[in-house]
Amino acid sequence: KAECIHEFQPDVVVDAILAKRNLGTKITDAPFVVGVGPGFTAGEDCHCVVETKRGHYLGRCIWKGSAIPNTGIPGMVGGVSKERVIHSPGTGMIRGIAHIADIVEKGQILAYVGDVPVEASITGVLRGIIKDGYYVPFGMKIADIDPRKEEKKNCFTISDKARCIAGSVVEILLSNGILPK
């Protein structure tokens, strides 16, 4: 909820929660507000939006309008799209069994949501998983598997997409005279 924003009174707010929608960020939260991804409209709830959809427009700085809407379809990785993303099978506290960078097999238990097991949907490298102890609602994205086992090193580096988006945020701030103090 970022309720502390008003306590800190920052010069800039960058909403990079990546929830694929605006969870309450307002253009009045700071003198300069950047929204990252779909759900933000430049000039309404932020000053600028950064495009996060892979492709020709990734990292584009949008000064009027919105990012491309969320399609709900994950990007293709190693020939796999929807199958690599795991959603919560129930509502409750998550308890992880597998860890980021583990090689997992299809059907292997990765975690539990409450008492409900969460199984690997494909064989590959576990690229991401929600941290233990978090409450997750039914259907929330909780894990991501990369089918390319040989790309385990990617678990410990910053992706091309993340670098592009971060670079765009820096470009936006510097082009508006916003410098670190």
Protein language model annotation of sequence segments:
Residues 1-181:
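Well-ordered secondary-structure scaffolds
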